[in-house]
A protein has these predicted regions:
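Single, function-defining residue in the core of a domain
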Residues: 1-64, 79-92, 100, 104, ...
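A short, well-structured juxtamembrane/interface segment
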Residues: 108-117
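Conserved mixed alpha/beta core segments that line enzyme active sites in large multi-domain catalysts
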Residues: 143
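Short, charged amphipathic recognition helices of the HTH superfamily
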Residues: 63-76
């Protein structure tokens, strides 16, 4: 009986089935509770399990419920009161969030490895590091109501693997004013040999750079205005050019490092929006990697900015009603978990249709919309037992099943909408009275229609 129902969903709602299978592979309930038990410090499970909290937050991230309160009210067997639920959410420790992101990425990585893909730099695993500050929350907490300034619930440092399109690690910071450089030392301590870290100038400090060097990892970091003091500087040598400008290179040495590092200078053909005409990169990559390759690799760092935009706009990572720092950070971490699942779906659909549509770029937004449209009905029609086997399925079996489902997806329905560059509009002076004036859209349209020859 259930197989017939599942077959109909496979044909008519393949994205929702793919999402459910991927979620079961990445975040099975039993595994979440095990991670919580192993990572918690002072928090106790009590009656409400951590898996139930993550399930509720995922419903909000995927757009299946408008808020945590609405998701909790629709949950049939919530074992605690709403007050107890919010107390649990407000006490979720950052160490638990990090363990969930690390573990779920590790569970999805073998499935991603079954799919086609090329490494950005042969022999190296890319890691893009950047920070994301959560916006000001509503002042619902009593101590915040008398504060005139914005209430910032915290920030996170995120590590992104662009080759596998997975967020592999995060560090959640409850103090919104805590230095990113200080927090980054936690991530650098976990760096491994064979990794190549990309970071902006904010992370150009001797402690971080030497940390990567000692871990036998490589780095490409943009030079900061107050960079570590240089003990040695070689002569500048021509290094060709890349797509955006002319390259030169020199060797540099700092205190405590016997082997010199590399300093790449890029003189841009056109200035940036901020008026910059050149930028400099530091790297400890071997000479076999050319300056052009280093410059092109650093340009990939901007992919994490697009990641933050998609997590915010598509997966509701910034829930302003959650004012407690730990609750807001839980919302962001859950959105990251959902993003990794959608990244797997995106890669599967693109590979399944590569022969027919080689340039297909699947939109994360349209994927999320597709999931929302059919997911609720699928959960009603099929019992939880229909999915439990996927939590222990092999990566090969999971990838094959997802690719089979992906062939039922219409590429046109999930493709990214292409648009041309925006045309700049002149911003002249306008009287304040004209700005405040209201107009009737219907009258303006009628007037414009009458003026058209």
């Amino acid at each position: 009986m259930w197989s017939e129902v599942l077959e109909r969903f496979e044909r008519h709602a393949p994205v929702s089935v793919m999402a459910r299978v991927a979620l079961e592979q990445a975040l099975p309930a039993g595994w979440i509770d095990e991670v919580f038990e192993a990572s918690r410090q002072r928090q106790y499970p009590r009656e409400l399990m951590m898996s139930s909290v993550v399930e509720l937050m995922l419903l909000v991230s995927l757009g299946l419920r408008p808020s945590l309160h609405a998701a909790a009210r629709k949950m049939e067997q919530l074992p605690v009161s709403l007050a107890a639920l919010y107390d649990k959410v407000n006490r979720t420790e950052p160490a638990v969030l990090r363990a969930l992101v690390q573990g779920s990425a590790a569970r999805l990585a073998p499935v991603m490895a079954q799919l086609e893909g090329e490494a950005s730099l042969a022999g190296w695993r890319l890691r893009i590091l950047d920070g994301n500050h959560l916006p000001a929350s509503h002042k619902r907490l009593a101590p915040l109501r008398d504060q005139r300034g914005a209430a910032l619930p915290g920030h996170t440092l995120v590590v992104y693997d662009p080759d596998q399109a997975l967020v592999t690690d995060i560090v959640a910071c409850e103090d919104a004013h805590e230095s990113e450089r200080t927090v980054a030392q936690t991530l650098v301590a976990g760096a491994q040999a064979g990794e190549l870290w990309l970071a902006d100038s904010h992370f150009c400090t001797r402690t971080l750079l030497q940390g990567w060097q000692q871990a036998q990892a490589a780095f490409i970091v943009r030079e900061h205005g107050t960079h570590p003091r240089l003990l040695e500087q070689g002569h500048w040598q021509e290094a060709g050019r890349c797509e955006t400008g002319v390259l030169t290179e020199q060797s540099i040495g700092i205190e405590g490092e016997a082997v010199p590092w590399r300093r790449i200078q890029l003189v841009l053909d056109e200035p940036t929006r901020d008026g910059l005409t050149q930028l400099r990169l530091w790297s400890n990559l071997p000479p076999e990697v050319t300056a052009e390759q280093i410059a092109n690799l650093y340009r990939r760092r901007w992919r994490i900015e697009g990641l933050f935009g998609r997590i915010e706009s598509v997966l509701h990572s910034e829930i302003r009603t959650l004012g407690h720092p730990r609750a807001a950070l839980l919302g962001f971490a859950t959105a990251v978990l959902a993003y990794n699942v959608l990244s797997l779906l995106k890669r599967c659909i693109e590979q399944a249709h590569r022969e027919q549509v080689p340039e297909l770029d699947v939109s994360t937004y349209h994927l999320a919309v597709d999931v929302v449209s059919d997911y609720k009905g699928m959960l009603i029609a099929l019992p939880p037992d229909a999915w439990s086997s996927w939590s222990e399925a092999s990566p090969v079996r999971t990838a094959d099943y997802l690719l089979r489902l992906a062939r039922h997806v219409s590429p046109r329905s999930v493709a990214t909408s292409q648009r041309g560059p925006k045309k700049p509009k002149p911003k002249g002076y306008v009287e304040a009275a004209a700005v405040r004036k209201h107009v009737s859209t219907a009258r303006v349209l009628r007037s414009a229609k009458g003026a058209t020859p």
